[in-house]
Design a protein with these regions (language model features):
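C-terminal cap/substrate-recognition subdomain and adjoining C-terminal extension
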Residues: 35-48, 52-58, 62, 77, ...
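A metal-dependent, Asp-based hydrolase signature
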Residues: 94, 99-178, 182
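N-terminal low-complexity, Ser/Thr- and acidic-residue-enriched intrinsically disordered segments
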Residues: 84, 92-95
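Secondary-structure junction/capping motif
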Residues: 11, 96, 254-257
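Non-catalytic pre-domain segments flanking phosphatase-related domains
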Residues: 2-4, 9-10, 14-84, 106, ...
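A generic structural micro-environment signature
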Residues: 7, 94-95, 102, 111, ...
Length: 263
């Protein structure tokens, strides 16, 4: 991508959407032996190589925050939309939310013992990773439906937060909250410093990503849009209202058509 020069013909939404694609454009990490003068000139976005991708980010922010620029964007209109999987957090070898659901299966089966000898729950309980890798999409849908529904929204949020505090990736031996891309954290910080409001639009589960994003990126729930299930309204014995997560799909945010309002 070439550096973006000021031009009255530049589409502001296009400028913002370049941020979604930047990680794929070049290598992100600076060499450990980078000269001192390069580090000094690269105080902004220090984990990025000097090059077209980094310059594009700097140019987007420059031309949209300079009041004398024809591409100036007022404070209330400054938004930056990011994908999540493979952009902000790692997606290989397995999505973090899928790992969470697989690890939730024993607790679900404890409450619903009739699932113990039913596939795909039987395979997950076996701990056989080779067999789990072969599970079909339909199998995963059954697991997600069983592990992500049937509890109140508050209970789900508490469970997800608790898991994120203790779970470790088996390969890296690090919390999943640390398996994010440092260069992109720098982009988020740089945009906030220039009055941009970051949003996440993802095909991942909206409720889980909202918990993760608030903890790791500081992005509040209302700025995260993802695949969402329905909820059922009810009252507790003490008369307090609550929402229970339902298996009904409310928004499938995995297709371009479902995201057209954000482009």
């Amino acid at each position: 991508m070439s550096p973006i020069a000021p031009s009255s013909g530049i589409n502001r939404r296009l400028l913002l959407w370049t941020l979604v694609l930047l990680p794929a454009l070049c290598g992100l990490l600076l060499p450990a032996t980078a000269p001192a003068q390069l580090v000094t000139s690269s105080a902004l976005l220090p984990s990025w190589n000097d090059g077209p991708a980094k310059q594009a980010i700097l140019d987007v922010v420059r031309v949209t925050t300079d009041r004398s620029s024809p591409n100036y964007v007022s404070f209330e209109d400054r938004i930056a939309v990011f994908d999540q999987d493979g952009t902000l957090w790692v997606e290989h070898p397995m999505y973090t939310q899928v790992v969470y659901c697989l690890e939730r299966v024993p607790a679900v089966v404890a409450k619903r013992p009739e699932l113990k000898n039913v596939e795909p729950f039987k395979t997950v309980l076996s701990g056989n990773r080779e067999a789990m890798v072969k599970l079909s999409l339909r199998d995963l849908e059954k697991i997600l439906a069983a592990t992500l529904t049937g509890m109140t929204v508050e209970e789900f949020n508490a469970e997800a937060k608790k898991w994120l505090e203790t779970a470790r990736d088996p390969r890296w031996k690090r919390p999943y909250t640390e398996l994010v891309y440092q260069p992109m954290l720098e982009v988020l910080r740089y945009l906030r410093d220039n009055a941009y409001k970051p949003y996440i639009v993802t095909g991942g589960g909206q409720d889980f990503v909202r918990v993760y994003a608030e903890k790791v990126y500081g992005i509040p729930p209302e700025q995260v849009v993802g695949t969402a299930g329905g909820t059922k309204f009810g009252y507790a014995k003490d008369g307090k209202p609550f929402l229970t997560k339902d298996a009904k799909l409310l928004l499938n945010d995995t297709t371009p058509a479902s995201r057209k309002g954000f482009t």
